[in-house]
């Protein structure tokens, strides 16, 4: 007789023989089938999940164009040209042939790796959001009637090219449009000309016609041509998304919470769940392979597979001793497979763990595996901070955070890395050398640069080390290490803190700065203070005519005759005479001097013969030389303060902060022995690496632009025709090929080797060397280069006049010398050429040969100089125009590929700037790259070139975290290893994972997709936990991700990627959850089934869950610049120019966080009209898409990644003392929120003017059909017991499509209002993973931001409650100043005493005799709640407690009870909530509400309890059911009035 045991034995044996697939399967199946048919049969059940966008799918051609645009606009325009006739997929036989045509066109511009990334990107539909954003921007224009394509000229639209001419004539009268980063701008020859935006669909004939006409206009300089995608007739298909996870969690059935209402299944396309998996392994049998080998046995194979599935799907619980080693055993099972198959096994086990666990307990674990894992774990902890069981992923050493990084960010990382690796590969750097160079940390440091303050130009007021006023202070630096209270400023007799005021005495702010200096001195702040007076330094000007010179001479006189301190006192007396709003005058100085020094002739101090003029010239020289920017400037230890920090109120505070900050720096230096007592402290400060001779904001700016120097070719600038046909990268390569360099020890070129020195710094000097400014720049560069052996320089000429022999003599001479002369001769000759007198002499007709230098071959030089070929100059000019985007004659310095400029006409860029540039390059990148290049053993000239090219490539990368080194992890026994293909660029990918964690469920499928996408050296290290005491994974999981678009058998696009749970066990109760990227808000839109309670035994075949991406979130952080604190209660609105207020939100005090719901498009962020807008103004914004000075803050949402902005606000001058929350309701009396008050009396929204005090606001949450059934009954019980208007607020996140469809109908029948509110759990707040706990979190954590400010008070009523009284009474209940009121737990039912956990332990001591309150019913005074920042306090406490998995077991209840000391609770009278579990029967008759609490003693199902406890419950239930039947009938007959209900859910959503 057959038994399940026999089947399992047979399966196990077969699994061992899995490689012998060609055994006679007919025999095996013939043996197995009798067993199979003797077992109970059951249909295979499945659950599928899909996620689509709200917007329609765009042609893949458009998305491919955006992929290329990310690489360069050049590639975009070339691709557009190449695809003019592709059209849409309608023009092709099949979708597949259209797809192939798009790929073929794109592949011409892409490397093989980039080709794979394009396929992946099209599968992800990454750029569909970009196309939709353009579509929304086009709709906002709006498009003219009946136009497939249209043009917009400065806000005027047309689709008629004839009308374009007239619009161009008047364009200058209208403002230019705001252009966005993602716009496609055609290269323009005249940036000043009008902007013409073409909205059209590429690949179509109509586009092609207009496009070519616009190109010709652009080339003529008549227009600036910008292209934006626009589809006049979009497809009706939505976009199927991927890059998310679907979890099927097993629910506890301790309390039965499943609705008994029967639902009708829907028709589902059977191909959706076809067994298409090529491997399809069950218990060792590879059914995909078997179907291929034995097609005739397909029916029997199907039955046999079904039997094996059912026999493995039993989920009997495991004993504790069986759980202990599960993590190691799973690792052993995974590592037993070879190569990529081990990833397949990891994916299969982790994603189906509940049914795999029993079999895994039989796996043996080798001692080597265990020992290696434990050894590696020491390294994991020490180097990357991982504990056993933690997971991590690194790509080329970059940490990919699995919790916060979504697949779209990961794709960006892959793409950026591909660019760098391919760049290095093109430069001939491969394999290990490539990865060593890639991991160099060469990002420019964020250091604040300082200038040297050891200058005679500074007049020091005091000196802490010698002045007698500081004699009582200790002088030892060891004092720094003595403990003090935080914030105490140490008074030590050392010049540790030096403050220099660089001022123009007659500037209006000077008086304020001097009074701050006086405050520091009089309060004995340990600051050495100095002044630099920047005054007119002309010798003709004296102090009797010029107030600035008068102040300087008066100060110098007193300093010389007495001392600096007295000189400063004189200075303050002078400025005390200056009235507010005025500036200092000569008479102010004269009157003070006459009063203080009556015996001295004032004219002798201030007049023409004054002897007190020292450091007047030096002061101006120092100011100009250091380049510190416009006056006034204040330096702290040489570092300039920001302009906004010079505000008198700010400066004092910031200086104190700086003193404390630098004290920490000195403490460390003293502790480490770097700074000792006998050292000069100022010398020590000035020898720090951040001290530079000159601060040039051009050089130090964070925004940096680099040339792409990675192309290689054999072209040169001396063939202009060939040069002009190259693309930007090709032109740059030709320029680099043609360069000859000047160096200190001579010139290295292709022919001449004077030395074998690698020079890590390369300057290309760009300018018109036939003009004085270009020559000056070259001269300064040569002067600097003579002092440094690290530098080589060469030149690119950017002529300012028409090119001819007569307009270019000097550059032609320079070029001829570089081509023909030995290095030292060329350098000396070019130095002469850079001098002004040479240019003057040449212009006067002197022969060029007159300027020859010793050792020069004059005849060879003259031969080249006089040759008529001008190709090299034409090539240089074209390069400056097309690649460097310069106007004629503009100057630029290119240092290791970094473009600095264009410089302004009169802008100084001198020897010190070159010194600073060299300094920075050597420190950040030059030396590190040089040492690696030296190891490659290439010749010197090539090596210097390589340093330059590698530096440009690496420095151009976006700044990120440092790469992590992980070479020392052992991988013999405990790691999956996949070697890369030889000879190709590869990614170095390292994963650390515990195979029985949620991270493994995501990581395994991700790595499997990556193996198909990219060439990689992959190591996956096992990081197992030992001694498990609980089942580590209690859910099934699918990660939706495909490496390429798939097609059906007839070559049509397959119905997007979906999650499939096939062959699921049928006995458990499941709940379905989606894990989506942080910024996505999704909702369930179609399924008749209860996704919170999926019970497959009651399902016919398939549960198909359809979700929709409802919103993309715009998130932000907001701060008040005056206080540095978030402006609590500030409101923002988000809208478009046509509809300014679509959504709004409130700023939290936690991190100043806010979130707004949006979708792809251009959005305008504003302060909300009312108090927010009255009190505040937006001061600055970061991460947005509009210029900093623009009135509107524009934000573009054009991808699926998170968009996080920073907004700084400032109170308006006349509102400085206003409190935002003091009267926060006025702004809500009308306007936006009123438009949401939506009654059902047929009135328009704006006519419904309810008095907000005469409405009962009731908030509730529900998930699953049973609780939604309870919720409808609760609502009915509320409505039956009150005459006051009611508005229900429901948390939208977890409501089923069925509920959302029915609620508008119910609202209309019973005449109540409702709104669906929504908030995405912020990423920075500790996440809950279990659905029930997430819902509990929403009940308490976001009350201040979930509701608009119009809501002053609301009641929370649990879904499973029955109300028996008028809730108006509770709404009007006096909370005695508390922000909320809760009912305490009953303690009258004595038999439940053993279950009252709050009566003992932690809760008993914390409550100290107070009541423990139940969260089923509460009332919140939102005005008070916000005023005392209750929401922020609750979130803060939650963040601390929730890290411990054992705390907050009843989150929504434990948190407010835990916070009673910080956020007081008003206890409501007991009769407000009666619950049979805790309250005795006698008190039931007084009950105002009855709650169907769970009973831990009886575990009675909710439905049974409801019928037994509440007599009226069944009547309510029947009434609702009748209404649902009516609704269904009307829906099927088509008589349902859907005008209101269709929009219901949208109309009522709010944040």
Curated annotation (Swiss-Prot):
Enzyme class: transferase
Keywords: Endoplasmic reticulum, Glycoprotein, Glycosyltransferase, Phosphoprotein, Signal, Transferase
Short motif (Prevents secretion from ER): ranges: 1548-1551
EC number(s) per entry: 2.4.1.-
Transmembrane segments annotated in the record for this chain: none
Subcellular location, record wording: Endoplasmic reticulum lumen; Endoplasmic reticulum-Golgi intermediate compartment
Renumbered residue ranges of the record's region Disordered: 1531-1551
CDD domains: GT8_HUGT1_C_like
Pfam families per record: Glyco_transf_24, Thioredoxin_12, Thioredoxin_13, Thioredoxin_14, Thioredoxin_15, UDP-g_GGTase
Domain of life: Eukaryota
Pathway in which the depicted protein is active: Protein modification; protein glycosylation
Catalytic activity line of the entry: N(4)-(alpha-D-Man-(1->2)-alpha-D-Man-(1->2)-alpha-D-Man-(1->3)-[alpha-D-Man-(1->2)-alpha-D-Man-(1->3)-[alpha-D-Man-(1->2)-alpha-D-Man-(1->6)]-alpha-D-Man-(1->6)]-beta-D-Man-(1->4)-beta-D-GlcNAc-(1->4)-beta-D-GlcNAc)-L-asparaginyl-[protein] (N-glucan mannose isomer 9A1,2,3B1,2,3) + UDP-alpha-D-glucose = N(4)-(alpha-D-Glc-(1->3)-alpha-D-Man-(1->2)-alpha-D-Man-(1->2)-alpha-D-Man-(1->3)-[alpha-D-Man-(1->2)-alpha-D-Man-(1->3)-[alpha-D-Man-(1->2)-alpha-D-Man-(1->6)]-alpha-D-Man-(1->6)]-beta-D-Man-(1->4)-beta-D-GlcNAc-(1->4)-beta-D-GlcNAc)-L-asparaginyl-[protein] + UDP + H(+)
Keyword Signal belongs to the record: yes
Keyword check for Acyltransferase: no
SUPFAM superfamilies per UniProt: Nucleotide-diphospho-sugar transferases
Annotated region described as Glucosyltransferase, given as residue ranges: 1244-1551
Glycosylation sites: 269, 536, 1228
One of the GO BP terms on file: protein glycosylation
In-chain residues carrying the UniProt-annotated modification Phosphoserine: 1277
GO function term, MF aspect, one: UDP-glucose:glycoprotein glucosyltransferase activity
Cofactor(s) annotated in UniProt: Ca(2+); Mn(2+)
Function as written in the Swiss-Prot or TrEMBL entry: Recognizes glycoproteins with minor folding defects. Reglucosylates single N-glycans near the misfolded part of the protein, thus providing quality control for protein folding in the endoplasmic reticulum. Reglucosylated proteins are recognized by calreticulin for recycling to the endoplasmic reticulum and refolding or degradation.
Homology family: Belongs to the glycosyltransferase 8 family.
Domain comment quoted from the record: The N-terminal non-catalytic domain is assumed to mediate recognition of proteins with partial folding defects.
Subunit relationships: Monomer as well as in a tight complex with SELENOF. Interacts with METTL23. Part of a large chaperone multiprotein complex comprising DNAJB11, HSP90B1, HSPA5, HYOU, PDIA2, PDIA4, PDIA6, PPIB, SDF2L1, UGGT1 and very small amounts of ERP29, but not, or at very low levels, CALR nor CANX.
Protein name, entry field: UDP-glucose:glycoprotein glucosyltransferase 1
């Amino acid at each position: 007789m057959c038994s399940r045991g026999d089947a399992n034995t047979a399966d196990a044996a077969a699994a061992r023989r899995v490689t012998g697939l060609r055994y006679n399967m007919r025999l095996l199946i013939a043996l197995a089938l009798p067993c199979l048919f003797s077992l109970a049969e059951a249909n295979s059940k499945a659950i599928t999940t899909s996620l689509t966008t709200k917007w329609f799918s765009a042609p893949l051609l458009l998305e491919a164009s955006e992929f290329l645009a990310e690489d360069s606009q050049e590639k975009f325009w070339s691709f557009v040209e190449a695809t003019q006739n592709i059209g849409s997929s309608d023009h092709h036989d099949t979708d597949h042939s259209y797809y192939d045509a798009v790929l073929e066109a794109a592949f011409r511009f892409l490397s093989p790796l980039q080709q794979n990334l394009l396929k992946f990107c099209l599968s992800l539909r990454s750029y569909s959001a970009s196309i939709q954003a353009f579509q929304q921007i086009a709709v906002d224009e709006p498009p003219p009637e009946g136009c497939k394509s249209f043009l917009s000229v400065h806000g005027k639209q047309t689709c008629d090219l004839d009308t374009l001419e007239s619009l161009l004539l008047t364009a200058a009268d209208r403002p230019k449009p705001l252009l966005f980063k993602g716009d496609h701008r055609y290269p323009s020859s005249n940036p000043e000309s009008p902007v013409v935006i073409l909205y059209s669909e590429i690949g179509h004939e109509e586009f092609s016609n207009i496009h070519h006409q616009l190109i010709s206009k652009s080339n003529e300089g008549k227009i600036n041509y910008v292209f934006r995608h626009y589809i006049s007739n979009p497809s009706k298909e939505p976009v199927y998304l991927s890059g998310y996870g679907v979890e099927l969690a097993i629910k506890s059935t301790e309390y039965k919470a499943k609705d008994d209402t029967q639902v009708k299944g829907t028709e589902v396309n059977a191909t959706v769940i076809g067994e298409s998996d090529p491997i399809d392994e069950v218990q060792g049998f590879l059914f995909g392979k078997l179907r291929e080998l034995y097609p005739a046995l397909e029916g029997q194979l199907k039955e046999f597979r079904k039997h094996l599935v059912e026999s493995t799907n039993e989920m009997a619980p495991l004993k504790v001793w069986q759980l202990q080693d599960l993590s190691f055993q799973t690792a052993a099972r995974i590592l037993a497979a070879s190569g990529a198959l081990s990833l397949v096994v990891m994916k299969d086990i982790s994603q189906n763990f509940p049914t795999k666990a029993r079999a895994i307990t039989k796996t043996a674990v080798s001692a080597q595996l265990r020992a290696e894992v434990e050894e590696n774990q020491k390294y994991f902890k020490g180097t990357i901070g991982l504990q056993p069981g933690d997971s991590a992923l690194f790509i080329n050493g970059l940490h990919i955070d699995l919790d916060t990084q979504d697949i779209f960010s990961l794709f960006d990382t892959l793409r950026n890395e591909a660019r760098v690796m391919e760049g290095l590969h093109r430069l001939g750097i491969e394999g290990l050398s490539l990865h060593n160079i890639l991991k160099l940390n060469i990002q420019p440091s964020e250091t604040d640069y300082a200038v040297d303050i050891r200058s005679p130009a500074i007049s020091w007021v005091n000196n802490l080390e010698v002045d007698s006023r500081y004699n009582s202070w200790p002088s030892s630096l060891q004092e720094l290490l003595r403990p003090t209270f935080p914030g105490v400023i140490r008074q030590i007799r050392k010049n540790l803190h030096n403050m220099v005021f660089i001022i123009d005495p007659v500037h209006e702010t000077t008086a304020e700065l001097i009074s701050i200096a006086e405050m520091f001195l009089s309060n004995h702040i340990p600051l050495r203070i100095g002044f630099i007076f920047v005054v007119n330094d002309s010798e003709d000007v004296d102090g009797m005519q010029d107030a600035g010179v008068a102040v300087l001479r008066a100060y110098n006189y007193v300093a010389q005759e007495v001392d600096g301190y007295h000189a400063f006192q004189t200075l303050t007396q002078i400025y005390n005479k200056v009235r507010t709003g005025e500036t200092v005058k000569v008479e102010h100085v004269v009157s003070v001097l006459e009063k203080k020094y009556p015996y001295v002739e004032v004219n002798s101090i201030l007049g023409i013969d004054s002897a007190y003029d020292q450091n007047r010239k030096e002061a101006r020289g120092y100011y100009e030389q250091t380049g510190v920017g416009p006056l006034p400037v204040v330096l702290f230890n040489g570092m300039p303060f920001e302009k906004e920090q010079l505000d008198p109120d700010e400066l004092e505070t910031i200086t104190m902060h700086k003193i404390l900050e630098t004290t920490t720096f000195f403490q460390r230096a003293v502790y480490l022995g770097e700074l000792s007592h006998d050292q000069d402290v100022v010398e020590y400060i000035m020898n720090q690496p951040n001290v530079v001779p000159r601060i040039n904001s051009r050089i130090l700016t964070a925004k940096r632009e680099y040339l792409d120097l990675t192309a290689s070719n054999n072209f040169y600038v001396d063939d202009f025709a060939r040069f002009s046909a190259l693309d930007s990268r090709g032109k740059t390569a030709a320029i680099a090929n043609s360069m000859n360099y000047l160096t200190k020890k001579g010139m290295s070129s292709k022919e001449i080797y004077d030395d074998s020195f690698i020079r890590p710094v390369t300057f290309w000097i760009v300018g018109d060397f036939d003009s004085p400014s270009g020559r000056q720049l070259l001269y300064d560069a040569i002067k600097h280069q003579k002092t440094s052996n690290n530098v080589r320089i060469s030149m690119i000429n950017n002529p300012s006049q028409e090119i001819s022999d007569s307009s270019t003599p000097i550059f032609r001479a320079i070029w001829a010398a570089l081509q023909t002369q030995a290095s030292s001769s060329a350098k000396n000759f070019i130095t002469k050429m850079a001098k002004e007198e040479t240019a003057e002499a040449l212009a006067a007709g002197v022969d060029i040969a007159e300027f020859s230098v010793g050792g020069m071959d004059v005849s060879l030089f003259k031969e080249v100089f006089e040759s008529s070929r001008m190709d090299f100059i034409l090539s240089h000019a074209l390069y400056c125009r097309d690649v460097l985007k310069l106007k004629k004659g503009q100057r630029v310095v290119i240092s290791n590929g970094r473009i600095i400029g264009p410089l302004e006409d009169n802008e100084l860029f001198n020897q010190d700037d070159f010194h600073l540039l060299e300094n920075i390059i050597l420190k950040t990148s030059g030396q590190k790259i040089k040492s690696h290049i030296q190891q490659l053993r290439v010749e010197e000239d090539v090596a210097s070139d390589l340093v330059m090219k590698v530096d440009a490539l690496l420095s151009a990368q976006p700044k990120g975290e440092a790469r992590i080194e992980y070479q020392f992890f052992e991988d013999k026994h405990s790691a999956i290893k996949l070697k890369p293909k030889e000879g190709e660029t590869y990614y170095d990918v390292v994963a650390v994972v515990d195979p029985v964690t949620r991270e493994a469920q995501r990581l395994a499928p991700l790595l499997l997709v990556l193996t198909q996408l990219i060439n990689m050296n992959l190591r996956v290290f096992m990081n197992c936990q030992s001694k498990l005491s609980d089942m580590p994974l209690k859910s099934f999981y699918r990660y939706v991700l495909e490496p390429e678009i798939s097609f059906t058998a007839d070559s049509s696009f397959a119905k997007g990627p979906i999650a499939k749970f096939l062959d699921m066990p049928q006995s458990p109760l499941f709940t379905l959850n989606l894990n989506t990227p942080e910024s996505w808000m999704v909702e369930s839109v179609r399924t008749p089934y209860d996704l919170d309670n999926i019970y497959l035994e009651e399902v016919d075949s398939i549960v198909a869950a359809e979700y929709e991406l409802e919103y993309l979130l715009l998130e932000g952080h907001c701060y008040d610049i005056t206080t540095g604190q978030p402006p609590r209660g500030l409101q923002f609105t988000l809208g478009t120019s046509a509809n300014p207020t679509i959504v709004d939100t409130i700023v939290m005090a936690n991190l100043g966080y806010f979130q707004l719901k949006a979708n792809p498009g251009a959005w305008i962020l504003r302060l909300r009209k009312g108090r927010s807008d009255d009190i505040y103004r937006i001061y600055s914004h970061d991460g947005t898409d509009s210029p900093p000075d623009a009135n509107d803050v524009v934000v573009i949402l054009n991808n699926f990644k998170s968009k996080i902005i920073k907004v700084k606000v400032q109170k308006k001058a006349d509102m400085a003392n206003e409190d935002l929350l003091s009267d926060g309701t006025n702004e809500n009396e009308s306007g936006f929120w009123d438009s949401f008050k939506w009654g059902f009396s047929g009135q328009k929204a704006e006519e419904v003017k309810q008095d907000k005090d005469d409405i009962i606001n009731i908030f509730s949450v529900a998930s699953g059909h049973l609780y939604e059934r309870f919720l409808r009954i609760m609502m009915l019980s509320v409505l039956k017991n009150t005459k006051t208007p009611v508005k229900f607020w429901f948390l939208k996140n977890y409501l089923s499509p069925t509920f959302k469809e029915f609620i508008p109908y119910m609202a209309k029948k019973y005449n109540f209002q409702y709104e669906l509110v929504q908030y995405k759990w912020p990423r920075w707040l500790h996440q809950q993973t279990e659905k029930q706990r997430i819902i509990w979190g929403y009940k308490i954590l976001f009350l201040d931001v979930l509701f608009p400010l119009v809501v002053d008070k609301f009641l929370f009523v649990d879904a499973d409650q029955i109300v028996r009284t008028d809730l108006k009474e509770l709404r009007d209940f006096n909370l005695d100043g508390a922000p909320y009121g809760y009912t305490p737990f009953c303690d009258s039912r004595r038999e439940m005493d053993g279950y009252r956990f709050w009566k003992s332990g932690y809760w008993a001591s914390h409550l100290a005799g107070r009541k423990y309150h139940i969260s089923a019913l509460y009332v919140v005074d939102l005005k008070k709640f916000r005023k005392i920042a209750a929401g922020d306090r609750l979130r803060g406490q939650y963040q601390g407690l929730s890290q411990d998995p054992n705390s907050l077991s009843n989150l929504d209840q434990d948190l407010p009870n835990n916070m009673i000391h910080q956020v007081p609770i008003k206890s409501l009278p007991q009769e407000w909530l009666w619950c049979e579990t805790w309250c005795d029967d006698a008190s039931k008759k007084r009950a105002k509400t009855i709650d169907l609490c769970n009973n831990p003693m009886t575990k009675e199902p909710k439905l049974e309890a409801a019928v037994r406890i509440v007599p009226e419950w069944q009547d309510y239930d029947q009434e609702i059911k009748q209404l649902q039947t009516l609704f269904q009938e009307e829906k099927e007959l088509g008589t349902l009035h859907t005008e209101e209900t269709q929009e219901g859910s949208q109309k009522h959503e709010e944040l």
